[in-house]
Every structure is written in C-alpha cells, then in structure tokens.
Swiss-Prot record:
Function per UniProt: Subunit of the V1 complex of vacuolar(H+)-ATPase (V-ATPase), a multisubunit enzyme composed of a peripheral complex (V1) that hydrolyzes ATP and a membrane integral complex (V0) that translocates protons. V-ATPase is responsible for acidifying and maintaining the pH of intracellular compartments and in some cell types, is targeted to the plasma membrane, where it is responsible for acidifying the extracellular environment.
Assigned GO CC terms: apical plasma membrane; clathrin-coated vesicle membrane; cytosol; endosome; synaptic vesicle membrane; vacuolar proton-transporting V-type ATPase, V1 domain
Expression sites (tissue/organ): Expressed in brain (at protein level).
Gene designation: ATP6V1E1
Topology in membrane: Peripheral membrane protein
Protein name: V-type proton ATPase subunit E 1
Amino acid sequence: MALSDADVQKQIKHMMAFIEQEANEKAEEIDAKAEEEFNIEKGRLVQTQRLKIMEYYEKKEKQIEQQKKIQMSNLMNQARLKVLRARDDLITDLLNEAKQRLSKVVKDTTRYQVLLDGLVLQGLYQLLEPRMIVRCRKQDFPLVKAAVQKAIPVYKVATKRDVDVQIDQEAYLPEEIAGGVEIYNGDRKIKVSNTLESRLDLIAQQMMPEVRGALFGANANRKFLD
C-alpha cells in the first residue's frame, strides 16, 4: 500500500525531529565536554601560575633573609672592628702615658743609675763580644760611664772573658728619648737596644695578654697566651 503524501511528510518530519534532537544532544555533549576541558585547563593554568607566584615569593623571601644575614654579619664585623680599634687606642694611650712617665725615672738620679747599671750589663751579656761600644744620650754620659766601669769586672768574672768596652762620644742617642743605652759589637753590625722606650715596648709586648685580660677580661675564644 503506497504511502500518501501526508504520511511521507509526517515520516520526514519525524526523522528530521529525531536528527535535530540527536544533533542537539551531541552539541550539548560537546559543549559540556568542552566546558569541562576548559575548566580543567583553566584550573591547571591557575594552579601553575599560583605555584609560580609562590615559588617567586619564596625565592624573594630567601633572598631577603640572606641579605638580612649578610647585613647583620657586616654590622657585627664593623662593630667588632670598632671595639678592637677602641681597645688598641686605649692600649696605645696607656703605653704613651707610660713612656711620658719614664722622664720621672730619669729625674731620680739614684734610681736611674741603678737602671743604667742593669741595662749596660745586660747588653754586654747579650752580645758577648771581645769589643763593644755603648751609645747613650750626651747628658747621660757620666752615669753611663759609671755603669760601664761597674759592669766590666762583673762581666769578666761571670764570662771568664776579657772585654774592651768604649762609650761612643762621636754619635749620641737623641736627646728626645727618655734614656737608656744602645750597645754595638766592634764593627757596629750587631746592636742591642736597651733604651727605656725599647725596654718598655718589649715588656708591653710580653705582657700584652695580661694587659688585655686586666682591661677587657679574658678572651673566651683564646686557648693559648702569646
């Protein structure tokens, strides 16, 4: 039985409606999948950017922390150097004051004579030369001459050696120094400096750990004394 035009049109409409419905469902499915993929990609991008931002600020925070440590270390080093300079300045001032007080020793002739006796004899013992030359300040010549005359017999007995000791009257020590003597061997190539300043410097060097300890306290980081 042949279909009428109305039936054909009805079937065509039904098929078109089915195709349209299927197309709409497919389009909705594609849209949903596309939206899902978009949201996933958007979330991935957001997470990636969030991680990048976090890494950036973590790196910046570490850099700032490192800069703080370096700056703090520099400040502590500068402060430590200032303290050391202040301590050195104080010790230098004390030594300068001690050198100025040496003039009081020289003014006491009796005391100074005893000191010169010891300095001359000590210098002779240090050189142990057959011929030695003593140099002094011009104003100390009489005292040094007396010291040499006392030292020679003592030296001979102690060393069992003969010795010729002369006082240099051509070149004297500067008048500006506090006092004391310099003693040379015969050809003046070897010298023992026993001026008051040189003896004070030597004592200061030997006693420096004790001086620092008395002024500033013991150094906890120091295991050995100089």
